Structures are given as C-alpha cells and as structure tokens.
Amino acid sequence: HHRAQQDREPGDRAPDRALTVGITGAPGAGKSTLNATLCAELLARGRSVAVLAIDPSSPFSGGAILGDRVRMGDVAGADGLYIRSMATRGHLGGLTGATNDAIAVLGATGRDLVIVETVGVGQVETDIVDSADTTVVVVNPGWGDAIQANKAGLMEIADIFVVNKADRDGARDTVTDLESMLNLSGGHDDGPAQWRPPVVSTVGTTGEGVAELADALEAHVAHQHATGELDRRRSAQRSQRLREVAVARVGRALDDLLATGWGGALRAEVEEAHTDPWAAASRLIERLAQQLTDD
C-alpha cells in the first residue's frame, strides 16, 4: 500500500544511527549561542555535526525543512557542519514524530552527532527526551529558574544541566540550587549504574565552560555504552514510535472518512442530536476498521 511505504523511515532501523543530543530550556536561556559555541568545540575535536533547530510554535510546513539558521553565526559555513530548521506544529506525529523523521534523514548523511535544539517561544519542551540519547537542559542564573526547571519536569529528563550566562549575578546560587535538587532526587536512572547529571557553568558568548560541556557529553555517551542504557533508551523510543506512527495513521484515516459523504451525514446526525456521539463513534470505528482491512 503506497501510504505505508511513504511513512517508512529507513533511518529508524539503522542500529548505528548518529548520536542525538537534545538541547532544551526556557526561551531566552541563550541556547542558540551556546549551541553555536558547542558546535565549534565539537568540530575542533574532529566530530561532524548536524544541527536541527525545531520550532514547535510555528506551523509545520508539510515536510519542508526550512533554510539554514542565521543565528549560528561564524560556525554556519564550517565544514562538517550541517544546519537545518523545521517547524513542527501540526505535524501528524507531533513534535516527536517530526523530529524523529528529521533525525533519521540527518543521521543518514553520516554525521557523528545530531544536535536537536528547540527554539521558538512556546513552553519548555520536554518531548525532546523521546528523540534524544542525551538531553541537555539549559537554565539562566536566577533562583526562580531552577525552581521552574523542577516544575516543568526538566529535572526528570536532564542528563546534563547547563547554567548559561554564568557571568551574571546569581549564577553560583543557581548551580548550588540545582546540585541540591539533584541530591534530593538522586538522578533519573535507577540501579547501580546510575548517572548523576553534572551541572556545567558556561558563557555561550565567550565559550567559557563549553569544553567542559563537550566533556560531559562524551562522558554521558561512554556511560550509556558501558551500561547498555543507550540500547535500552533506543528500544523504548522505537516502541513509543510504533504507537505514534499507528495513531497518526489511524487519525489520518479517520479524518479522511469524516470528510466523505458518509462521514458528513454521520456528523450531521450527531450535530442535530438524532444520534448520540457514543453510538456514532462506534459506527465510525466499525466503518474505519472495515476500510483499513479493505486497504
């Protein structure tokens, strides 16, 4: 069936897909500048990097990956670096679906590393954890920010914390806050092979602390390989992806069915209270099942 063919992602099956690093945090945390400096550091270490800047607040444009980022500044033209940005709002598979599709494509270009950065003004994205091998959470100095991180559920997903703009007042306090929160929560991987998220201080604009961040990334990758955590994480992501793809496909078929004459008539019955939504839904599902079987 041609549609099933279309939905297939060859990159997803490749066991040696590129390592994926997700960078998230509140808007205004300086993620883009930090990411640019981090890319420069990784390139200097001989890594090849693809950057995917995701804007969950912009409407998805039907698969078009938008042009190169201007915000990357000096590194944008560097060899070994590939930059794309993408809008994801309204993508059938949601943020994760759109991201995973793009990671599969970028991974196929043979890069060592894909860095996924969430941009845009939406709320803090925690979905990134469904696509990343390593999740980096960036916060700004200021006591409130660490508390916000806790509220937004970032404590659970962070593999590495970065206090960016560390030359500002309150940076040291923020580091201390995060450290004590981590002491309480004890990290997020259970078992003897536990990883404790390090807290790295950086100044994205000058590159201060960025080498430490790159070291932390490498340490986390090594830890995941040594403990088998990487395989566990990816298995869980694949299983999650199975459900997402199925839900997206069924949702699409449902919309198609509702757009037919039969679907319109059924909707009209519900709108005019001739049929209750539950009975109508049962008929809809029966018809859909029939149609999916015929396909």
Task: Give, region by region, the residue ranges found by the protein language model.
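Nucleotide-state-sensitive switch-loop elements of NTP-binding domains
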Residues: H1-V21, A26-A29, N35-A146
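Actinobacteria-biased recognition of intrinsically disordered, low-complexity terminal regions
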Residues: Q6, T293-D295
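Signal for well-folded cores of large energy- and translation-related assemblies
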Residues: C39-L43, N100, A104-G107, V129, ...
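Residue-level signal for inorganic ion chemistry
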Residues: D55, E117, N164, L178, ...
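Short beta-strand/turn micro-motifs at beta-sheet edges
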Residues: V70-R71, A146-K151, G187-G191
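Conserved P-loop NTPase nucleotide-binding/switch module
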Residues: T118-V163, R168-D177, M181
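Canonical P-loop GTPase G-domain recognition
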Residues: I160, A166-Q224
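Long, well-ordered amphipathic alpha-helical subdomains in the mid-to-C-terminal portions
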Residues: S201, E212-L292
